[in-house]
């Protein structure tokens, strides 16, 4: 499935080989220094999150079970990245939310095939933020994801594919 996605579904052949964790450089330093990638809930509790990248409005309406998991995207260039990337004056941030800011964005890449074999890993076809999307697990469910939409990078189908560009992989442990 991953090979087929690399060869036939993604505009960038290496994207389907990885799971992408999006964060700010200050958080990346913390992650690399500790050797651990924490869920939002654990990072907040342990006070290891230097920059709160996400919109408070979005986090407040996201299920606590989701923020208790480590989250990855199937691809870069997500709508979240578009809204939050780069230093922005607070008045220009997503819905005026001061937290929705990633001054120096960093993606940490993880081997997707290995990640998917870990116990408890699930994935969704769209974002887990807000009310969240249905989560799946297993090879059969993975094969049914709409990778043509998940990896689509065109403007022609943007209204259809935008939510799929947020597709996520979640791991239950930090």
Task: Set out the residue ranges of the language-model regions.
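Active-site-proximal loop/hinge segments that shape catalytic or ion-binding/gating pockets
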Residues: 1-174
